[in-house]
C-alpha cells in the first residue's frame, strides 16, 4: 500500500488521505483547514512557521501535498517501512516514538483512543466521529484544537475536544517564559 496517497493493494480498502498513521485526523489541523477554507489564515500560519505559503499547504498526511513537517514524519516513514496502515498494527505499539509524539502537543492527546477506534469501526467511520468531536455545537463549523472559540461564529468552546482539553491547550499557547 502506498501510505502517502492512500492507494490500497488487492483486497484492501483505500485509506482516506486525512487519516494519519498515528491516529490524527488531518481534517481538523489548523494548516489543513486554512489550506482549504482560509487563505488569509494560511498566510499567517506560514509566517509563524517560517515557511513559504505554498509549503504550508496540506491535503493530509497521506496526500502528495504536505507541509515540510509532515513530509519528514518519522511515524509515517516507519509505518511505510513495516507495511502498516496505522501504528496500532505494529508489534512494537505503542513505541517510544509515538509516546513522545503524543506528549509534545495537545492536539495529540487522544491518539491511542483514536487508533483503538479506527481498529473497531474503520477509518471512514472514525473520521466522521472525530469531525463531530471538533464541530462547533452552535454553527456546525469544523475547528482545530487550537481554536478556543469557533472560527466562524465565536462560540466558546469551539468543540467538544476543546471543552475536554481546554486547560492544556491554553497552557500550550502561552509564550515561553524568558
Q: What spans do the regions from the language model cover?
A:
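Hydrophobic scaffolds flanking metal-cofactor catalytic centers in soluble metalloenzymes
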Residues: 2-122, 132
